[in-house]
Amino acid sequence: MKLTCVVIVAVLLLTACQLITADDSRGTQKHRSLRSTTKVSKAADCIEAGNYCGPTVMKLCCGFCSPYSKICMNYPKN
């Protein structure tokens, strides 16, 4: 019974801390447009499927690099 009360109090305390932190940080992100453009440019900077992706290539594949043929491949669709 004592352990249950301690767990309940701990969960309530952690929930309250998260809510306080979420309210406090609202609207404080600066340079929002700059951050989104860097994410897009990083996502588009990859090797397309069918191209060589060996150890001398500096870019990553958009999908995955086949370990045997060293050719970029798309992920299979389920």
Swiss-Prot record:
Propeptide: 23-42
Tissue note: Expressed by the venom duct.
InterPro entries the UniProt entry points to: Conotoxin, Conotoxin_omega-typ_CS
Protein name: Omega-conotoxin-like 2
This protein's UniProt keywords: Calcium channel impairing toxin, Disulfide bond, Ion channel impairing toxin, Knottin, Neurotoxin, Presynaptic neurotoxin, Secreted, Signal, Toxin, Voltage-gated calcium channel impairing toxin
Recorded GO CC terms: extracellular region; host cell presynaptic membrane
Signal peptide, first to last residue: 1-22
